[in-house]
UniProtKB/Swiss-Prot annotation:
This is Small ribosomal subunit protein bS18c. Belongs to the bacterial ribosomal protein bS18 family. Its main location: plastid. SUPFAM superfamilies: Ribosomal protein S18. Part of the 30S ribosomal subunit. GO terms for cellular component: chloroplast; ribonucleoprotein complex; ribosome. GO terms for molecular function: small ribosomal subunit rRNA binding; structural constituent of ribosome. Keywords: Chloroplast, Plastid, Ribonucleoprotein, Ribosomal protein, RNA-binding, rRNA-binding. Pfam families: Ribosomal_S18. The keyword Ribonucleoprotein applies.
Length: 73
């Protein structure tokens, strides 16, 4: 029988995920600009939803690109 260990979240439980913190948000994006899933990032469900909202806000305000044009060319 396998023993599963819970991963520690890279963001502390009460840390605020700010849409203006582009450096933090970019750690959770792929090279193509997609948001990494929970199973890879190790975030909790609540943190992942807050991260998703923050990334979407940052994209709308042009702080983050919607897609990485360097990958297309």
């Amino acid at each position: 029988m396998a023993i599963f260990r819970r991963k520690n979240s890279p963001i502390k439980k009460d840390d605020f995920i700010d849409y203006k913190d582009v450096e933090l948000l970019s750690k959770f994006l792929t090279e193509q600009g997609k948001i990494l899933p929970r199973r890879i990032t190790g975030l909790t469900m609540k943190q992942q939803s807050r991260l998703t909202k923050a990334v979407k806000r940052a994209r709308i305000l042009s702080l983050l690109p919607f897609i990485n044009r360097d990958m297309i060319l």
